């Protein structure tokens, strides 16, 4: 039996980040957390590209375009969708979630889902590091680990 475990090492990796401008007071915090975590784990600052989009619904297509360039080893999707009084929240959350999963599987590229889907502004702020923890930073670490475990699987397959 073979066990594959990924290490958190960003040396030599090129990372794309798509981030929604809507609810920027939250998404900027997520972005900062992701960038700082990537650099802390060995990704060169110049190897991190950020694409700002109007809202979360625009993230999947932008991520797909980023991946199509073949410049990125993996991508992080960041946004904050906060429930309002209408069904709009449900449609946006469903669309962005399905879109990101579809792009990841279709392109065989890891995309970390850092789109917060919360009932309140306070919940979004908590998850963006205003109190503790930052889902952007968590996504960065998860992406590096996922990329490493995928490399290990491919390496074993080639052996």
Curated annotation (Swiss-Prot):
GO biological process: riboflavin biosynthetic process
Pathway: Cofactor biosynthesis; riboflavin biosynthesis; riboflavin from 2-hydroxy-3-oxobutyl phosphate and 5-amino-6-(D-ribitylamino)uracil: step 1/2
Key words, A-Z: Riboflavin biosynthesis, Transferase
UniProt: (2S)-2-hydroxy-3-oxobutyl phosphate binding residues: 85-86, 127
Catalytic activity, EC: 2.5.1.78
Any Pfam family matching the protein: DMRL_synthase
NCBIfam families the record matches: lumazine-synth
Name of the protein in question: 6,7-dimethyl-8-ribityllumazine synthase
């Amino acid at each position: 039996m073979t066990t594959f475990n990924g290490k958190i090492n960003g040396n030599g990796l090129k990372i794309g980040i798509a981030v929604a401008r809507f609810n920027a007071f939250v998404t900027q915090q997520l972005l900062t957390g992701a960038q700082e975590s990537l650099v802390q784990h060995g990704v060169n600052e110049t190897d991190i590209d950020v694409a700002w989009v109007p809202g979360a619904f625009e993230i999947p297509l932008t991520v797909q375009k980023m991946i199509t360039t073949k410049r990125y080893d993996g991508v992080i999707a960041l946004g904050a969708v906060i429930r309002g009084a209408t069904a709009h929240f449900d449609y946006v959350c469903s669309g962005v979630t399905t879109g990101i999963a579809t792009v990841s599987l279709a392109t065989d590229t890891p995309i970390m889902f850092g789109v917060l889907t919360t009932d309140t502004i306070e919940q979004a702020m908590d998850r963006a590091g205003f109190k503790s923890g930052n889902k952007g930073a968590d996504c960065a670490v998860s992406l590096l680990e996922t990329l490493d475990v995928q490399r290990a699987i491919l390496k074993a397959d080639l052996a």
